[in-house]
């Protein structure tokens, strides 16, 4: 908990817990009890089963079961990555995201495979909370200005932007200014 405390007490607005969700859900519950909406959970799945420890370990826990458990302990935001799609620029796993969005009331952020403006539009139309665009920005597959306009103009769901005042986040390499990731 010391690391979570440190980040949240020193200006970081949200901490994402990944492997801890499957390996130590009690820790996640304590963190959520203390920090509420400032704790999000990252669920990475390989063939629908949750992976941990940098994707080295695949558990016997289904991603929907973990999401439901996290919702029960108070997690409000889940970042979902289909490992097979991550970095492949082949589009997100919309079906798994749709199932996840229907299974829990948590805010769902898509990660993995988002490669075009059309992918962003499809995810928005699925009423997801957001999307992480990594490699597509790095390779130029997504126009940053268009992505931001789509996110701010229509918003994934306007109510979320109004309620939480979320803004797209852009991650850049400090020395070169190269855009590395956009989270909208």
Where are these regions (language model features)?
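A broadly tuned preference for mixed-charge, low-complexity surface segments
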Residues: 45-51, 91-93, 127-137
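Alpha-helix N-cap/helix-start and coil->helix boundary motif
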Residues: 22, 47, 116-117, 138, ...
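Catalytic cores of alpha/beta
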Residues: 1-11, 17, 26, 95-131
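C-terminal helical cap(s) of enzyme catalytic domains, especially alpha/beta-barrels
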Residues: 27-34, 39, 101, 120-154
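Conserved anion-binding
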Residues: 2-86
């Amino acid at each position: 908990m010391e690391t979570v405390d440190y980040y949240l007490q020193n200006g970081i607005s949200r901490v994402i817990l990944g492997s801890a969700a499957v390996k130590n859900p009690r820790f996640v519950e304590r963190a959520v009890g203390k920090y509420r909406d400032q704790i999000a959970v990252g669920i990475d799945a390989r063939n629908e089963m949750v992976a941990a420890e940098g994707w080295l370990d695949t558990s016997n826990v289904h991603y929907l079961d973990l999401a439901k458990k996290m919702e029960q302990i108070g997690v409000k935001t889940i970042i979902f990555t289909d490992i097979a799609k991550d970095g492949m620029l082949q589009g997100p796993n919309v079906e798994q995201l749709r199932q996840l969005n229907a299974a829990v009331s948590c805010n769902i952020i898509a990660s993995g495979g988002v490669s075009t403006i059309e992918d962003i539009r499809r995810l928005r139309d699925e009423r997801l909370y957001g999307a992480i665009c990594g490699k597509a920005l790095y390779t130029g597959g997504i126009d940053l200005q268009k992505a931001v306009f789509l996110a701010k103009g229509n918003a994934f769901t306007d109510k979320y932007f109004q309620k939480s005042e979320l803004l797209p986040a852009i991650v850049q390499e400090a020395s070169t200014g190269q855009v590395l990731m956009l989270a909208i």
